[in-house]
Design a protein with these regions (language model features):
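Mitochondrial intermembrane space
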Residues: 3-6, 16, 21-231
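Repetitive helical segments and hydrophobic/amphipathic motifs
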Residues: 11-14
């Protein structure tokens, strides 16, 4: 999907799915909401922050304008509570899906990661005209219903310490979920993730690992992932 406003496309590892498009970014919790509480045992140190608090960061986003009213209501709640409820988050994605269906797409499939984060599944490559139309439609529906909510939700579940450096945010997430050794560093992550052979010291197909990556703007897909049939 092409609507994410702050995500950065990951380096195309050799493991990335072939013959399908790579969508924008992006976990199942049992509670009705997720909160932006930091862990003091994440194994990370220092680092420039996006803002002093989630509330301040959301305020910065809202000050830039161009946020649809339905999403602004959800973001205003996040400013005061530090969370986005599961019901609000799923409603935003439901509205996006319906918007795309109304534009004539056969189906919109979502992948759910262990933290509750959703991303749209990849799809088989269409014609140049089809892909151009999809990009425009996805951006339009995303901007209207879910793009800003997605970015904030990703911060809450994947980067509660608000690190400005995406790699540091990923490593912090991996530490918090005990997915890498305590001595695993950002430098090591950057070296492994920029490689072309797909070799890493952790399981890249682990859904918790992928949740850490996707919530922080890295988009990783595999040939075995579910795909949607758009046309």
């Amino acid at each position: 999907m092409s609507f994410c406003k702050t995500c950065v496309l990951a380096v195309a590892l050799s493991m990335l799915l072939a013959g399908c498009s790579i969508n924008q970014d992006a976990t199942g919790t049992s509670s009705d909401s997720v909160t932006s509480e930091s862990s003091s045992e994440n194994g990370s140190t220092g680092g420039q922050k996006l803002a002093a608090s989630l509330s301040e960061w959301v305020e910065q986003r809202e000050s830039q304008g161009n946020i649809a009213e339905s999403q602004k209501t959800i973001l205003d709640k996040a400013k005061s509570t530090g969370e986005i409820s599961t019901s609000d988050y799923e409603k935003a994605w439901s509205d996006y899906r319906q918007c795309m269906i109304d534009k004539g797409y056969k189906e919109i499939k979502l992948i759910k990661y262990p933290s509750g984060l959703y991303v749209e599944a990849g799809h088989k490559q269409g014609t140049t005209i089809q892909e151009s139309r999809y990009s425009d439609d996805s951006t339009e529906c995303g901007d209207e219903y879910v793009a800003d909510v997605q970015d904030v939700y990703g911060i809450i579940v994947g980067n509660p310490n608000l690190y400005a450096d995406q790699a540091q945010a990923v490593v912090d997430c991996l530490h918090r979920d005990s997915l890498v050794p305590k001595d695993y560093t950002v430098s090591r992550f950057n070296k492994e993730f920029s490689g072309t052979d797909g070799n890493t010291s952790f399981d890249m197909q682990n859904l918790q690992v992928r949740s850490c990556l996707v919530s922080n703007g890295y988009n990783v897909g595999y040939a075995t992932d579910d795909t949607e049939q758009l046309w």
